[in-house]
Design a protein with these regions (language model features):
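Multi-pass alpha-helical transmembrane bundle typical of ion/small-solute transporters
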Residues: 1-130, 135-184
């Protein structure tokens, strides 16, 4: 098992270095990043299910912990997008709210990082981490929420609505994934 962990970690490291070579967003970079993530996941599963684990129940629990974390991070994006689409559908200012997404660039990536940090802090037994994650996000986004340089078709209210609804949906998803797992 040690050899498998070392090989997977080495492959992930090589791919990480090679991924810096292509231009940002290139197909090769995306493929390398995906394979690198798969190597990291396989390494984590091997480590969590391997030596030092007391019995099959603990091994499966560790794997479930990791899979649930992946669901918290990856599943929250489509859910948040769907909730925002539902909000926009019933909104008379739909165009303004949709264009607010252009003001809040990087929201999908920030949301994934946010969900990962929240899931990790809850599973680690440190729920105070939620407050820290939300404070960092709020402070980082504050200039965009209050900027007078927004396009004329986007109101500050629409940007704030999108930020609040997206954040709450994202956080509730991560908390739900962690809470259901820990409710056993």
């Amino acid at each position: 098992m040690t050899a498998a962990v070392l090989v997977l970690t080495g492959v992930a490291l090589v791919l990480a270095v090679v991924a810096w070579v292509p231009k940002s967003g290139a197909t090769l970079e995306i493929v390398l990043s995906g394979v690198m993530l798969a190597c990291l996941t396989a390494t984590g599963i091997l480590l969590l299910a391997g030596h030092g684990v007391q019995g099959w129940r603990e091994a499966w629990w560790n794997i479930l912990l990791m899979v649930s974390g992946g669901l918290a991070v990856a599943g929250g994006g489509p859910l948040t997008t769907s909730v925002l689409a539902l909000v926009d559908r019933g909104n008379t200012r739909s165009q303004s709210t949709q264009q607010a997404g252009e003001v809040l660039r990087g929201g999908a990536l920030i949301g994934a990082l946010e969900r990962g940090a929240i899931y990790g802090s809850i599973v680690a037994g440190w729920p105070e981490g939620i407050a820290i994650v939300l404070a960092i996000k709020g402070l980082a986004r504050y200039p965009e929420l209050r900027s007078p340089d927004q396009p004329a078709s986007v109101t500050p209210t629409a940007v704030a609505e999108r930020f609040i609804i997206g954040t709450f949906t994202s956080v509730l998803w991560a908390v739900t994934c962690a809470g259901l797992l820990l409710s056993r």
